[in-house]
Amino acid sequence: GRVALLTGGRVKIGYQAGLKLLRAGAQLIVTTRFPRDSAARYAQEPDFGDWGHRLEVFGLDLRHTPSVEAFCHELMGKLPRLDFIINNACQTVRRPPEFYAHMMEGETAALHATPEHIRKLLGSYEGLRSYNMLPESRLPESRLPESRLAEGRLPEAVASAMQVAIGQDISETAGLTRSAELSQVPLLAEELLGQKHLFPEGRLDQDLQQVDLRGRNSWRLLMHEVPSVELLETQLVNAIAPFLINARLKPLMLRTEAGTEPSRDKHIVNVSAVEGQFYRRFKTTKHPHTNMAKAALNMMTRTSAADYYADGIHMNSVDTGWVTDEDPAHIATRKVAEHRFHPPLDIVDGAARIVDPIGRTLAVRARHCRPAVVDVGLLLQVDAALHALSCQLVPGQLRGVVRGPQGGDSADVRRQVGGERVRRDRKRGHKAVE
């Protein structure tokens, strides 16, 4: 009966975390910019029939703040309760429109062409989308910039996305109703030149994502090289959107059914990264915008966790560990060939870490509950064990959920901000789970 919200649940760590929650019995709402692709991925799981009825997928572009507000408003009216929020979605390396182009046909096709079992996962979203689009009418071409109207200059999907971005009447919820189309809006000069050769059709990686052959990406940029667009997008996705979701949905997390006591084991997990840690001794001079965004996320947790704990909501920042090599493809390939290099953890390890705060709480509660509910805690306790094992592989990073006086947050994020505060906590007897 627990209800969870997971942002960025389409691929990689988010997808694996979604599966863990569903298989543990949760009702799950997943957000992604590409809802039909996400629904199809979940539907292909062999045990989909066991939990598919508890999954809903919504399209949402977290770069579009008014749409994030609208989505939270929708959940406030739709859900009777909300137990867990996992702010997993992030932007580390910005991808141009061509990276996502191979999904656009499926995302924009007529809904009746989508298999029924996938349509069911999208039912609430498509209903909301249709309702919000009723007053809309296709914008006349005259609303597009004249320099873009030349035949052949923009693909149809891009032209449609440009109309969405420019149209004043529909822009307020474009990130909710047209989340996939917005990925096709060219925002940088080089994105207007055509880069299809860098994203060869049909070449996907192990996560079924488009292969990116660019010689340089965001991970290699110095401060003076970061475009304003990327700086703003990174802040919006990694820090602003989690702030809004946590703030706007707090009343929903506190909502209780008539005649029942408020639950004090609700959780918010803000998915962080080593880039956001101040105490780390070795830090490169690259990708400062990503470091800034994750540091801001950690400070939100550090500041607000005590306030939320007073209402029984445990807020933690959790580092997934080193899961992905973000270097450009040719550099990553060279490292494998010359040094047999692979990141020490995988997406399952990362997912185990971010569900760990939830799993530990339910495991403890299960010891005091009837046998009928013990299975939920035991199942997620396995994830906690995997998490503990993975932590031993990456010494020096944020490890485990540190049990502090504010429900797991206090010492946790103090460790990210500075070790001195953590040591004082330990002197008071607050034990860190290593």
Predicted features, each with a name:
Residues A352-G377:
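Core catalytic loop region at the nicotinamide-binding pocket of NAD(P)H-dependent oxidoreductases
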Residues G1-T32:
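Canonical Rossmann dinucleotide-binding motif of NAD(H)/NADP(H)-dependent dehydrogenases/reductases
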Residues L62-K78:
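Conserved Rossmann-fold cofactor-binding substructure of NAD(P)-dependent oxidoreductases
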Residues P46-P66, S160, V164, W219, ...:
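Rossmann-fold cofactor-recognition segment
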Residues R54, R81, A305-T320, R365-R370:
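Conserved Rossmann-fold SDR core element
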Residues E338-A352, R365:
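A conserved structural motif in NAD(P)-dependent oxidoreductases
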Residues G52-L55, E74-N87:
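A glycine-rich helix->loop->beta "capping" turn
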Residues C90-Q235, I240, A247-A310, T320-R340:
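Catalytic loop of short-chain dehydrogenase/reductase
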